[in-house]
Amino acid sequence: GGSVDGSGGSSEAADAVVKTIIDNGGKAISNGASVTDDKGVANMVEQTLSEFGRIDVLVNNAGVLRDKSFSNMSMSDFEFVVDVHLMGTVKTTHAVFPIMKEQNYGRIVVTTSSSGLYGNFGQSNYGAGKMGVVGMMNTLELEGAKYNIHVNALAPVAWTRMTEDLMPPEAEALLTP
């Protein structure tokens, strides 16, 4: 049993998940703040603490794509993707890490990607952001150990709104639960 705060730039999907959780007897809230906005992240953390009293788990899973080959990519697209994936993870983690230290407990999950670990044509921005979170995860695992804070990374693959245009249609049947 746990409680869920679904946060992100688009509240519709999060609100649907919140409704499902509540309809099944759970507790959940949503927050449409962007992980790139310092004030929005602070408000998200305050809302979560106000509703649930503590933060035990943080899952960093915000994501966007702006795919183009590196020589054709604008710097604004590169920076935007890195800002969401890497700096969004940094900002949310930085906001909850002191809370978890004080609680002497915390679990942080960051999502990475095979694009960060191995590269993928047209995803230099995405790959840079996703590899950056791996470096941060490795360091925070060491720094958090004495406070019972565990930090891990997952490199999932799924059929989502973000990936549906990247995969062949037959992949949907294999990746939809």
Locate the predicted segments by residue:
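Substrate-binding pocket helix/loop in short-chain dehydrogenase/reductase
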Residues: 69-70, 74-79
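The catalytic Tyr-X3-Lys active-site helix of short-chain dehydrogenase/reductase
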Residues: 116-119, 124-132
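A glycine-rich helix->loop->beta "capping" turn
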Residues: 24-27, 47-60, 66-69, 105, ...
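A short, exposed helix-loop element centered on a Lys and neighboring polar residues
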Residues: 93-94, 138
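The beta1-alpha1 cofactor-binding region of Rossmann-like NAD(H)/NADP(H)-dependent oxidoreductases
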Residues: 11, 32-46, 75
